[in-house]
């Protein structure tokens, strides 16, 4: 086996998604996700995600590294702690995080996700 480099600049058709109705708090956010890589164990994923403005509840069953390319987002945990990120920001949302994700301006990010399979 000769593993190849995964180039995120290669065109890839994204999948349109949106938050579940019971998770939505504000707006009508529309997401596009393009998953460029899944490892053989199906526990590690990497790709590109974009969203229009809106706010929804989140409960992370995975750990996610995010690198925001464009736009502004705000994450808030259940205790009320708040983090705002703009272009160029990198951050990790750890497994078990609960709170809200708000897109203030249309945004795009690269993501790398690890989710343990049982």
Residue ranges of model-derived segments:
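Short hydrophobic/aromatic-rich beta-strand segments that constitute the beta-sheet cores
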Residues: 58, 75, 109-111
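Short, surface-exposed charged micro-motifs
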Residues: 35, 65, 90, 100
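A short, N-terminal "cap"/entry segment at the start of jelly-roll beta-barrel domains
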Residues: 1-43
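Conserved short histidine dyad/triad with adjacent acidic residue
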Residues: 39-60, 94-95, 117
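Short histidine-centered beta-strand/loop micro-motifs
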Residues: 35-36, 46-48, 56-60, 77, ...
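Ligand-binding loop in jelly-roll beta-barrel domains
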Residues: 95-118
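Short, conserved beta-strand element in jelly-roll/cupin
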Residues: 60-75
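Short acidic-glycine-tyrosine-enriched beta hairpin
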Residues: 79-95
């Amino acid at each position: 086996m000769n593993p190849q480099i995964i180039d995120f600049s290669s065109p890839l058709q994204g999948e349109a998604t949106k938050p579940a109705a019971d998770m939505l708090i504000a707006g009508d956010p529309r997401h596009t996700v393009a998953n460029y890589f899944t490892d053989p164990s199906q526990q590690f994923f990497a790709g590109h995600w974009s969203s229009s403005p809106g706010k929804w509840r989140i409960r992370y069953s995975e750990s996610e590294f995010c690198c925001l390319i464009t736009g502004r987002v705000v994450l808030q945990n259940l205790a009320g702690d708040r983090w705002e990120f703009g272009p160029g920001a990198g951050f990790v949302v750890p497994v078990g995080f609960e709170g809200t994700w708000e897109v203030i301006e249309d945004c795009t990010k690269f993501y790398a996700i690890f989710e343990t399979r049982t």
